[in-house]
Amino acid sequence: MIKLRLKRFGKKRAASYRIVAMNSRDRRDGRPLEELGYYNPMTDETNLRVEPLVKRLKEGAQPTDTVRRILEKANIFEQVRA
């Protein structure tokens, strides 16, 4: 199953995350199928690649809880339903 999840990068105690599409059995920092954006919790900054995200969600990719909240803030699910 394909999951949309966060992949950690950045410095110690100053983490940032990439939003990636990965197989659910792969480890957190393994090789992703596709990078779909990034999220910085320190500044609450997000940058999303909308078209590939919508495509992955329509194909049945399951977002984790944290990624779901980030996508809801950006109104991505409204584009999936349309």
UniProtKB/Swiss-Prot annotation:
A GO cellular component entry from the record: cytoplasm
Keyword Ribosomal protein: yes
Pfam family, one: Ribosomal_S16
Parts forming coiled coils: none
Top-level taxon: Bacteria
GO molecular function: structural constituent of ribosome
Alphabetical list of InterPro entries matching this protein: Ribosomal_bS16, Ribosomal_bS16_CS, Ribosomal_bS16_dom_sf
Keyword annotations: Ribonucleoprotein, Ribosomal protein
GO BP of this protein: translation
Family: Belongs to the bacterial ribosomal protein bS16 family.
Family matches, as PANTHER family: 30S RIBOSOMAL PROTEIN S16 (PTHR12919), SMALL RIBOSOMAL SUBUNIT PROTEIN BS16M (PTHR12919:SF20)
HAMAP family tied to this protein: Ribosomal_bS16
Protein name as annotated: Small ribosomal subunit protein bS16
Organism: Cyanothece sp. (strain PCC 7425 / ATCC 29141)
